[in-house]
Every structure is written in C-alpha cells, then in structure tokens.
Amino acid sequence: TYSDPLLFINNSKVTMAQNDINVSDNGVAAYMSGNSEFKNWNRITLGQKSVGIYGNNSSLVSEGTLIEGTLQKSRGIIGVNSNIRNSASIKMAGEESLGIYSGNTSGTLKNIDNSGNIEISGKKTVGIYLEGNSGQTVNNRGNITVHETTEPDRNNSTIGIYAKDGATVNIINEGQVNVGKKSVGIYSISDGNVTATNTALLNVSDEGIGIYKKGGTVNLGGTVNVADHISSANDSEPVGVYGIDGVSIVNNAN
C-alpha cells in the first residue's frame, strides 16, 4: 500500500523547473491517469518500497533526468493497464527493485517505449518487468547495464528485461545491453518474440546469459560479444542466446 502521491496528474501535463524530488518510504512522487505528461524534473530519489511515477489506465510520458533507488523494493515507474513512454535514466540498486513495471490485464495491447538508460544491480532487481494476461510490445532504445549477480542462486539473478508467461509480450531491443557475470540481459517466458535489431549491441560477461527465451522466436541482429569462459564453476559458460521449448532462433548478428 502506497501513501498519497505528491502530484496527481489526470489528463494533464506538468512541467517542472529541473526540481529534485525525494520520495519517502512507501511514497509516490507522481500518480498519472488518462493522457498525461510529467516533464523536466531533475532527480527523483526513491525510499524503500516507494514509486517514482505510477500510471493507472494511462498513456503516460516520463521526461526527466534520473530516477534513482538504492533501497529495497523500490519502483522507478509502474504502469497498470497503461502505455508508457520514458526517456529518463533509471538507476536501481536495492534488492527486488524494478526500473519499469508494466502489468496489463486490460484486454488491449499496451506499448512500453523506453529510450532512457537503465542501470541495475542487486538481488532479483529487474530493469523492465512485464506481466499480465493481455499483450504488450516493448521497444527499448536505451542502454541497459546489468551488473554482476552476487547471489549463488540463479533464481536471484539480476535481469535487464523480464517477460512473464501469461500473455504475448514482444520485445524489441535497438540499444546496447551489457550483461554482468551470472546475470541475464533479456529473460522471456511469454508467448511473444524477442528481436534485436541491426543497431543492437549485446555484451555478455563470463557466466552471463544474453537472451533466455522459452518458445517463440528470437530474431538476432546487430552485434553480439560473448566473453571468454574463465570460471571453473559447473555449467557456467557464457551464452549469447539460451533457448528452450522449441524456440526458433534466426541469427543475423555479427
């Protein structure tokens, strides 16, 4: 349960004067509904279990400098049955934190467009998390940096983009994804496809996984760099694409 937001934006546009916003524990900086825009803020600093921008049945636009969280279970942007367009940088370091969360049960397709840079670290922290029983399309044009996972359990990995099963989620990556040791760049168990365009760059460290895909299709373009395997741990080889359950991989990468 979140406390009342600092700003309530309904079918409106709010333009700040490069202000900084500090969000208390369990707080929300801006709650948005309808066609709304929140622009020109400088830095949103998140407390524990707090949210920078919360969109509900909205087509929201987020244009600022940085959303940053270092405490547990913070959320940069939450979209519930919403379209999201974000150009702000997001940096999350607290355990079980999410840069952008989108849950869609609306029955209509929702679009998530991110051009901001995302940097994540911490146990079970995810850059962009997608779930729900209705379809979504994600287009990432920013750079995503997934730092090393320090937890020994793979279930606690740090992940750049995660698509849960339950609906068709198509992920299109045009940007650079840097995957640290034992981490995952894109992890999709939805019915949709993962596409890396010809502008995409995927860098995978030792013991890392670039793209993990269950079923569907991976259209791999751009450039993929996989580090040499140095670790002596069992089953720890770095992988550009790891596919299971009949996934089709179309490889046009360099």
Predicted regions and their residues:
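Surface-exposed loop/turn motifs in large extracellular/passenger domains
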Residues: T1-S50, Y54-S97, Y101-S183, Y187-N254
